[in-house]
Amino acid sequence: MSNPDRSRVIRLAEAQASLPANERSVQVWQRGSLDVAFALPVPPKQQAPHSQDEIYIILRGRGMLVHDGRRDSFDSGDILFVAAGIEHRFEDVTEDLALWRVFYGPHGGDVAPVGTSS
């Protein structure tokens, strides 16, 4: 018998089907500090800085991520990273934008050791 806390497949179709009416995101899995949601962001919306590091995995659509004094374009298949405490928002996005939003790590962010480029 499998243990869903040890391994799991999260299906896009199931996440989309579980999205509550009139909602733009739904949590699909949580384990320890890991928190995964399916989201259909509506810009322009300034995101409040989060207490954990955050990854966006772009499933479809494209747009701009405004973060840390920068504007970076993104497209489906891209992965975006925003460190804990950084203000950010999406702009100029296509109507079909859909993504996985992943929070992880300790509150305050996961700090790379000094001397590394990660």
Q: Which positions does each model-derived feature cover?
A:
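A short, N-terminal "cap"/entry segment at the start of jelly-roll beta-barrel domains
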Residues: M1-A48, G115-S118
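Short hydrophobic/aromatic-rich beta-strand segments that constitute the beta-sheet cores
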Residues: V36-F38, L65-H67, L99
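Ligand-binding loop in jelly-roll beta-barrel domains
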Residues: A84-D110
